[in-house]
Structures are given as structure tokens and as C-alpha cells.
């Protein structure tokens, strides 16, 4: 299935969190928090300003981003969990 976000929305695939702590302890699945970073899979054209002009998106396909763990709406594409969120929900681009 192919999904194209509209306006200022972004399709993000969550990146799995680490399974081991810095001290070498393994974290069970029940104790893991939802990852708050992911890879941008698709972006919309941008937000429309009051004067009708489209404001270009800052993020682009392939960017790794940081977002609030409660951001976006969860969708399942081809059996894989993704998020559709507004660009404003993205806190930073990880470089």
C-alpha cells in the first residue's frame, strides 16, 4: 500500500529502541517505551498560509527525526506500524 500525506503531514516509521542498556542489561519488551524517533517515509506538500501560498516542508524523505512519544496517529502499512503526524509535532532532525 502506498500512502501520500496531505498538507503539512509526515509519514514516519518508528525506529526500534535499544534492547540493551549502556550497562549491558537487556530490556524486556514489556518494559520498553515506544520509540520517539523514526525515519521519514513520505511528506506532504506543505502548509497553506493565509495568503494561499504553500510553505515548504523542512523535513524530507529519509530524515531521521525526534518526536513526542504521543505524537501522530498510528497506521499499519503492509504489517508495519507507522505514524502520520504534523510537521509541527517533530521536535528535531537527527544528523
UniProtKB/Swiss-Prot annotation:
Protein name per its UniProtKB record: Co-chaperonin GroES
PROSITE patterns for this protein: CHAPERONINS_CPN10
Localization per Swiss-Prot or TrEMBL: Cytoplasm
Keywords: Chaperone, Cytoplasm
SUPFAM superfamilies attached to this UniProt entry: GroES-like
Stated family: Belongs to the GroES chaperonin family.
Listed Pfam families: Cpn10
Described function: Together with the chaperonin GroEL, plays an essential role in assisting protein folding. The GroEL-GroES system forms a nano-cage that allows encapsulation of the non-native substrate proteins and provides a physical environment optimized to promote and accelerate protein folding. GroES binds to the apical surface of the GroEL ring, thereby capping the opening of the GroEL channel.
Recorded GO MF terms: ATP binding; metal ion binding; protein folding chaperone; protein-folding chaperone binding; unfolded protein binding
A single GO cellular-component term on record: cytoplasm
Top-rank taxon, per record: Bacteria
InterPro entries: Chaperonin_GroES (IPR020818), Chaperonin_GroES_sf (IPR037124), Chaprnonin_Cpn10_CS (IPR018369), GroES-like_sf (IPR011032)
Subunit structure: Heptamer of 7 subunits arranged in a ring. Interacts with the chaperonin GroEL.
Gene: groES
GO biological process: chaperone cofactor-dependent protein refolding
CDD domains on file: cpn10
